């Protein structure tokens, strides 16, 4: 006859107690796995955008990386949530874009986190030449998202992304001197592989040069600059301001005679203005359909090197298919 397990009181441990014990054991295993994956001493990075989180993972795979934003968000406008404050408080290094992209929310997080290390931010924009600088420009609620330093969306140029990866590797090597040689090796390996992809993307994207598009915001400005695509119009009346009926009507009148090859928006933007404009332009173009292309402006939050490559590959592929 099978005996039941006996507890300290001498009573049998029934199925209910066995189930509880099983759940407790499973939870303990899960917690132990998490602790092993990220030791208490793990170097912690707070990345303002997913692209910098991905580069950090390429260079220091053992780092614990927190990401403030995701592909479905406009990085200009982020709420200073308690979870972000806690993550910034624990950070050994903060990696952001700069060029005032995070000026509306990062200082608030820094003030509330009270972490001196969070003040010495690695800003990607400090390590590349920015396009479209506007010296003396000041962003106001009436002027929109104006960046005096230049367009902050620099990660959409794979050449500049490579420059940032090199500079970030140097900074991480200083932060982690014991791992400096390993970081340098990973940086060189990433650069070699990325350059191979870059040559392939540029060769395949050659037909895009000179193609004309309308877009919402300057999110993809570096992509157009790299590929030689010509932006004709912006759906926003002012940078960062939502498209208005009056502005869209003026765009329609200006583009009707010679429609663009496509209208392009980021995946976090409202598709309705672009949908209306492409519908009107397609009607005006006597049967020639003007497509609305919705592109991801960055990688997933958990991305690494593979996802960076797939993301850039996807952008080139979508443009080749959409701008025929």
Language-model regions, residue ranges each:
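Bacterial N-terminal signal peptides that target proteins for export
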Residues: 3-28
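Short amphipathic alpha-helical segments with coiled-coil-like heptad repeat character
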Residues: 2-4, 191-192
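N-terminal signal peptide c-region/cleavage motif recognized by signal peptidases
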Residues: 37-39
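Extracytoplasmic metal-acquisition and chelation regions
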Residues: 42-324
């Amino acid at each position: 006859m099978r005996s039941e397990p006996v507890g300290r009181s001498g009573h049998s441990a029934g199925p209910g107690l066995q189930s509880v014990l099983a759940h407790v054991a499973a939870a303990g295993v899960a917690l132990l796995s998490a602790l092993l994956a990220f030791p208490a001493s793990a170097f912690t990075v707070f990345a303002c955008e997913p692209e910098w989180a991905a580069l950090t993972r390429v260079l220091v795979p053992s780092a614990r990386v927190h990401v403030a934003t995701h592909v479905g968000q406009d990085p200009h406008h982020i709420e200073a949530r308690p979870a972000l404050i806690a993550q910034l408080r624990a950070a050994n290094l903060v990696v952001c874009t700069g060029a005032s992209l995070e000026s509306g929310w990062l200082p608030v997080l820094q003030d509330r986190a009270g972490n001196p290390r969070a003040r010495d931010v690695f800003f990607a924009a400090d390590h590349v030449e920015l396009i479209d600088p506007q010296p003396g420009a000041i962003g106001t609620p009436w002027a929109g998202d104006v960046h005096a330093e230049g367009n902050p969306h620099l990660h959409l140029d794979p050449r500049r992304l490579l420059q940032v990866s090199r500079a970030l590797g140097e900074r991480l090597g200083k932060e982690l001197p014991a791992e400096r040689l390993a970081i340098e090796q990973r940086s060189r390996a990433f650069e070699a592989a990325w350059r191979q992809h870059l040559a392939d993307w540029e060769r395949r994207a050659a037909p895009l040069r000179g193609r004309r598009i309308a877009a919402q915001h300057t999110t993809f400005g570096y992509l157009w600059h790299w590929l030689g695509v010509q932006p004709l119009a912006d759906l926003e009346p002012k940078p960062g301001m939502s498209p208005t009926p009056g502005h869209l009507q003026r765009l329609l009148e200006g583009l009707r005679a010679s429609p663009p090859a496509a209208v392009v928006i980021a995946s976090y933007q409202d598709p309705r203005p672009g949908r209306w404009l492409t519908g009107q332009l397609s009607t005006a173009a006597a049967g020639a359909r003007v497509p609305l292309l919705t592109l991801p402006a960055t990688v997933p939050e958990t991305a690494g090197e593979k996802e960076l490559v797939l993301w850039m590959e996807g952008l080139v592929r979508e443009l080749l298919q959409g701008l025929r």
